[in-house]
Swiss-Prot record:
Catalytic activity: Hydrolyzes the link between N-acetylmuramoyl residues and L-amino acid residues in certain cell-wall glycopeptides
Residue sites binding Ca(2+) per the record: D34
Job description of the protein: Endolysin that degrades host peptidoglycans and participates in the sequential events which lead to the programmed host cell lysis releasing the mature viral particles. Exhibits lytic activity against Staphylococcus aureus isolated from human and bovine samples, as well as Staphylococcus epidermidis isolated from human samples, although with lower lytic activity. No lytic activity detected against several lactic acid bacteria and strains belonging to Bacillus, Streptococcus, Clostridium, Listeria, and Enterococcus.
Binding site for Zn(2+): H206, H313, C321
GO BP: any one term: proteolysis
Protein name: Endolysin LysH5
Record Gene3D superfamilies: endopeptidase domain like (from Nostoc punctiforme) (3.90.1720.10), Peptidoglycan recognition protein-like (3.40.80.10), SH3 Domains (2.30.30.40)
Domain SH3b stretches: 398-466
UniProt remark on domains: Contains a cysteine-histidine dependent amido-hydrolase/peptidase domain (peptidase C51/CHAP domain) at the N-terminus, a central amidase domain and a SH3b cell wall-binding domain at the C-terminus. The CHAP domain is present at the N-terminus and is associated with the endopeptidase activity. The SH3b domain increases the CHAP domain activity.
Lineage start: Viruses, Duplodnaviria, Heunggongvirae, Uroviricota, Caudoviricetes
Keyword annotations of the record: Antimicrobial, Bacteriolytic enzyme, Calcium, Cell wall biogenesis/degradation, Cytolysis, Host cell lysis by virus, Hydrolase, Metal-binding, Multifunctional enzyme, Protease, Viral release from host cell, Zinc
Length: 481
C-alpha cells in the first residue's frame, strides 16, 4: 500500500504541524505517540498499535507500508522517517518523532511531549498540557529504529493503456567495457637478456608472492635499473596490477621466471601482483587485467588460448605458484597443503583459458571463485602469509568488508580486541559495520571499524587460540558481504 502523500507533501505537512498539538487517541493529552499517529493517519489513514512508543517497530505490520531500519554506526536517516527511541526514554515507554533533517552525526526532528509537558492537567480523557510540536536536534542512539514510509510517487504512474504513454522502444542494455590497460614498456637496463629468436610459444601465469605495496609500478621502480645479480633471482616479462602493465622485457627476450630452460626460453612470464597482501577483490581485479593482457598478446602472436598456450609456473618446477589463484579458483592452498594436484592444476588452467577466451572474443567475463575458497572474506579462512602479529600477541590483517549481525546483541569493545577492554555499546541484531581490519585475540575473531572518530572492536565468532593457518573457528555470528 502506497502512502496518500508524496515525500515532498509529507515534509510540508510536518512543517505546518510545528506549534500545534495532537491527541489522536483522545487520552492523556498530547503524547509523542499521538503525534506519530497524526502523521501516520495523514499518510495511510491508519493508527499505529503499541502500549508505548518503543513498541511501534514490533507491534505493527509494516509490510507494504514502510521499511524498518535499526540504527547502526553508519546509518543515515532521511527526512520523513519516523524515529523510535528505546525504553531508556520516556520513563520506559520510549519516544517517537518525525525526522526533518539528518546527517551522520545527528537528526533534527519534529516531536511532541519531549519535555513531558504534553499532559499536565491530570485529566485522563482527553487531557491537556502546554507542550506543542517542536523542532529539535538529537544525537543518534542505540537502540533506535527508523521507519521509512512508502511514499506516493511524485508523478502518479499512468496506465499502460493511456494514450499519453509513449510507444515503448527497445533500449539496448549498456555493455560492460574492459578496463583500458596502461601498458608501460620500460625494459630492464641492468643486463641485456638474450633473444629467443621468435615469438613466445606460450604464456606462463605467476603469482608474485608480493605484499599489498608490490604493485606493477613498484616492481618497475625496483627492477628497471637492477644489476645482473638481482635479475638472476628472477625476472618476468610483465607485471600487472590494477590497470597497469609494466613490460620489463621485450617479447623477443628470454625471461628468467620458471627455473626451467624450456619455460624461460619459449614462455612469456606474467606476474599477477600483490598476491600475498591484497584483499581478494583487488587481487581478482589484477587477475582480470592479466587475462586481458594475455588475450591481447595471444591475438598479436596469432595463437589460440588452450592448455598448450596458457601455462602455470608449477608445470615447470615444484612450486606453490600461482598459490593465491589456486586457493581462489580451486579451493586448494598449495602453501599449506603441498603441491597442487593434477586435477586442480587442470581446473585452474581451464578457468584461466575460459576467462582469456572471453576477452579474445570481445566479451567481459565475470570472475568466479571456488565454493571451497573464502573469496568473499579472509575472515572465514585467512591466507596465512597475510597475517601479522603485534606486541600484544594479536594476529591481525587488513580487510575491508561489511559484517551484518545475526539475531543476538554483541558487546562492542573500545581500546582493543580483548573481553576485558571497556564496553563501547551493544551491537544490535540486524546492525552492520564496514570494517577495515580482522584480528585473532582472546578466544575470538574480531573486526575493527571507526565510527565518529572512535575505534571499535567487535567479536564475530570464536577462535580456538591456534596460530594461523591452523586456527579453528566457530560459527559466524552474522554475515560477511
Amino acid at each position: 500500500m502506497q502512502a496518500k502523500l508524496t515525500k515532498k507533501e509529507f515534509i510540508e505537512w510536518l512543517k505546518t504541524s510545528e506549534g500545534k498539538q495532537y491527541n489522536a487517541d483522545g487520552w492523556y493529552g498530547f503524547q509523542c505517540f499521538d503525534y506519530a499517529n497524526a502523521g501516520w493517519k495523514a499518510l495511510f489513514g491508519l493508527l499505529l498499535k503499541g502500549v508505548g512508543a518503543k513498541d511501534i517497530p514490533f507491534a505493527n505490520n509494516f509490510d507494504g507500508l514502510a521499511t524498518v531500519y535499526q540504527n547502526t554506526p553508519d546509518f543515515l536517516a532521511q527526512p520523513g522517517d519516523m524515529v523510535v527511541f528505546g525504553s531508556n526514554y520516556g520513563a520506559g515507554y520510549g519516544h517517537v518523532a518525525w525526522v526533518i533533517e539528518a546527517t551522520l552525526d545527528y537528526i533534527i526532528v519534529y516531536e511532541q511531549n519531549w519535555l513531558g509537558g504534553g499532559w499536565t492537567d491530570g485529566v485522563q480523557q482527553p487531557g491537556s498540557g502546554w507542550e506543542k510540536v517542536t523542532r529539535r536536534q538529537h544525537a543518534y542512539d542505540f537502540p533506535m529504529w527508523f521507519i521509512r514510509p512508502n511514499f506516493k510517487s511524485e508523478t502518479a504512474p499512468r496506465s499502460v493503456q493511456s494514450p499519453t504513454q509513449a510507444s515503448k522502444k527497445e533500449t539496448a542494455k549498456p555493455q560492460p567495457k574492459a578496463v583500458e590497460l596502461k601498458i608501460i614498456k620500460d625494459v630492464v637496463k641492468g643486463y641485456d637478456l638474450p633473444k629467443r629468436g621468435s615469438n613466445p610459444n606460450f604464456i606462463v601465469i605467476h603469482n608474485d608472492a608480493g605484499s599489498k605495496g608490490a604493485t606493477a609500478e613498484a616492481y618497475r621502480n625496483g627492477l628497471v635499473n637492477a644489476p645482473l645479480s638481482r635479475l638472476e633471482a628472477g625476472i618476468a616479462h610483465s607485471y600487472v596490477s590494477g590497470n597497469t602493465v609494466w613490460q620489463a622485457l621485450d617479447e623477443s627476450q628470454v625471461g628468467w621466471h620458471t627455473a626451467n630452460q624450456i619455460g624461460n626460453k619459449y614462455g612469456y612470464g606474467i606476474e599477477v601482483c600483490q598476491s600475498m597482501g591484497a584483499d581478494n577483490a583487488t587481487f581478482l581485479k589484477n587477475e582480470q587485467a592479466t587475462f586481458q593482457e594475455c588475450a591481447r598478446l595471444l591475438k598479436k602472436w596469432g595463437l589460440p588460448a588452450n592448455r598448450n598456450t596458457i601455462r602455470l609456473h608449477n608445470e615447470f618446477t615444484s612450486t606453490s605458484c600461482p598459490h593465491r589463484s589456486s586457493v581462489l579458483h580451486t579451493g586448494f592452498d598449495p602453501v599449506t597443503r603441498g603441491l597442487l594436484p593434477e586435477d586442480k592444476r587442470l581446473q585452474l588452467k581451464d578457468y584461466f583459458i575460459k576467462q582469456i577466451r572471453a576477452y579474445m572474443d570481445g566479451k567481459i567475463p565475470v570472475a568466479t571463485v571456488s565454493n571451497d575458497s573464502s573469496a568473499s572474506s579472509n575472515t572465514v579462512k585467512p591466507v596465512a602469509s597475510a597475517w601479522k602479529r603485534n606486541k600484544y600477541g594479536t594476529y591481525y590483517m587488513e580487510e575491508s568488508a561489511r559484517f551484518t549481525n545475526g539475531n543476538q546483541p554483541i558487546t562492542v569493545r573500545k581500546v582493543g580486541p580483548f573481553l576485558s577492554c571497556p564496553v563501547g555499546y551493544q551491537f544490535q541484531p540486524g546492525g552492520y559495520c564496514d570494517y577495515t581490519e580482522v584480528m585473532l585475540q582472546d578466544g575470538h575473531v574480531w573486526v575493527g571499524y571507526t565510527w565518529e572518530g572512535q575505534r571499535y572492536y567487535l567479536p564475530i565468532r570464536t577462535w580456538n587460540g591456534s596460530a594461523p593457518p591452523n586456527q579453528i573457528l566457530g560459527d559466524l555470528w552474522g554475515e560477511i558481504s
